[in-house]
Structure formats: C-alpha cells, structure tokens
C-alpha cells in the first residue's frame, strides 16, 4: 500500500465511522501519505477530532499491521457499549480495506464473582451485590485482560470496617 506515496487528492477518500453508537460527520483524507504511520496518525486525529464524536467523548485508537497491511480501529470505551463500524465509505477507502462491511466485535461487560456471589459488571468495573459484605469494593479489569481459567477473589472486612459497623 505504501510502496509509493499515497496522494488522496486524486480520488475521494471519505467515510463515516460510528463509535459506541454515535455516527461521525463525513471524514475525508486530503493529504499525501508517505508511510502507513503518517496515515494512521491522520486517521486517528480526524476521527477523534470529529465534533459529533467529541461531543459524546467517543474516541478510537488506530493501529496499522505491517504484516497484514490493514488498519484496525479500537474504541477507547469499555464493555458492551464499545462498538466501531463504518458507513458511507468511498470506493477508494474500500480499496484500502476500510468499507461498510468492516464491523468490529462488540465489547463485553466484565463478569465474575466476589466471595462466591455473582457481581455486577459495568464496562471494565466489577461491583459486588448491593448490601453484601463486599459492598463498596470495586474491581477494575485492565484493557486486554483475558481469562485463563477461573480467577477467585475473596474479601474480608478489616478492623476499620468492623468498627464502622459497630458505630452505626
């Protein structure tokens, strides 16, 4: 793709992207790109600079894989609201592999148990059941974490928690 500089003024390089359910304005590439890194940076800047997306704090990270010659777009949001899709892509964008058919995998809310009780997942945060001994505790799962079998976490209140309960 980048054996020679890509001059996007010669064709229509435009698209719309939906991030977490919000559709952008029409985004158009209008420069000459000597490397994939230049185009990756420009795509990320144009998408994250879009007024509609900025208005709802929706943003993406754009990456380029030299081995496959493809760009990837990852929402910075977490959980099941995290989605990325394209629409209104021009033929020139489709020739680069960015087309209306390109739909990302929807994110998932974290799931798990605390002290053997099913927690409530909201994005990357796992919360204990309301009123449980662990109430007030929250666990944040880092981006890219994946389960390799079962993970168990047990919780016990410390002396301060016990004293607080006695004072109430």
Predicted regions and their residues:
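Stable alpha-helical elements in mature extracytoplasmic
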Residues: 35, 39-43
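Polar, low-complexity export/assembly segments characteristic of proteins
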Residues: 1-36, 48-168
């Amino acid at each position: 793709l980048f054996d020679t500089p890509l001059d996007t003024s010669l064709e229509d390089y435009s698209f719309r992207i939906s991030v977490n359910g919000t559709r952008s304005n029409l985004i158009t590439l209008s420069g000459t790109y000597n490397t994939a890194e230049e185009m990756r940076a420009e795509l990320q800047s144009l998408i994250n600079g879009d007024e509609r997306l900025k208005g709802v704090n929706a943003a993406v990270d754009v990456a380029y894989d030299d081995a496959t010659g493809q760009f990837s777009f990852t929402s910075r949001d977490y959980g099941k609201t995290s989605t990325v899709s394209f629409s209104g892509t021009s033929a020139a964008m489709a020739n680069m592999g960015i087309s209306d058919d390109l739909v990302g995998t929807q994110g998932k809310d974290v799931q798990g148990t605390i002290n053997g009780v099913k927690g409530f997942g909201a994005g990357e945060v796992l919360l204990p059941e309301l009123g449980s001994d662990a109430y007030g505790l929250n666990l944040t799962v880092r981006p890219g974490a994946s389960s390799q079998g079962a993970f168990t976490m047990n919780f016990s209140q410390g002396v301060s928690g016990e004293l607080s309960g006695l004072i109430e």
